């Protein structure tokens, strides 16, 4: 799994070939699903939803990316993966700040919503008992959003949550049905365990 920014801002050998070499490596590694990061939009939404998605053996997930002025998903929201007898629902979302990080011309036809609200909406769908809209035994969230500091910086989860902001929201407000959260975007190293609100699980 990946939390995004697999392409864009890459080494010259990859960027000069529109990151096809990077996509080829990720395909060879067997990447099964990825959230989109802001850099996936560097060449615009049409490039992402067309050339990049067609070349990728894994889905580019963006549950909070919508067609302009609507709540219609512009990208796949989730992937269902098999792990033994379990079906794992993987939900992806990208930072809501993406419009400030990429060229507006390339994303003029889409909107970016609240990532936590989008993940929670899809989590409810995947656990509502209706197999016609997808069902999962285990839920995982991939957020292209992250903590401002990591373990090597001396940060703890409590400190990061006390700082508030987007990271605190995704930890505190993601639906308790989600068993694990993977994050990205901020280029920080950490692996924290936290109580899941309303449950006795971490």
Regions found by a protein language model. Give the residues of each.
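Acidic, metal/ion-coordinating pockets
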Residues: 1-202
């Amino acid at each position: 799994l990946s939390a995004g920014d697999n392409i864009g801002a890459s080494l010259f050998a990859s960027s000069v070939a529109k990151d096809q070499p990077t996509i080829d490596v990720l395909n060879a590694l067997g990447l099964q699903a990825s959230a989109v990061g802001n850099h996936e939009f560097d060449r615009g939404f049409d490039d992402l939803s067309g050339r990049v998605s067609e070349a990728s053996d894994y889905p580019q997930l963006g549950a909070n990316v919508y067609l302009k002025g609507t709540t219609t998903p512009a990208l796949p929201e989730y992937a269902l993966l098999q792990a033994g007898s379990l079906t794992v629902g993987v939900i992806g979302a990208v930072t809501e700040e993406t419009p400030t990080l990429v060229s507006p011309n390339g994303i003029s036809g889409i909107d970016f919503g609240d990532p936590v609200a989008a993940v929670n909406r899809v989590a409810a769908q995947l656990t509502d008992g209706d197999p016609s809209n997808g069902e999962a035994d285990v839920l995982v969230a991939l957020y292209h959003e992250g903590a401002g500091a990591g373990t090597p910086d001396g940060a703890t989860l409590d400190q990061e949550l006390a700082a508030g902001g987007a990271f605190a929201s995704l930890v505190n407000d993601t639906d308790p049905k989600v068993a694990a959260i993977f994050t990205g975007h901020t280029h920080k190293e950490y692996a924290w365990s936290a109580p899941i609100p309303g449950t006795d699980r971490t």
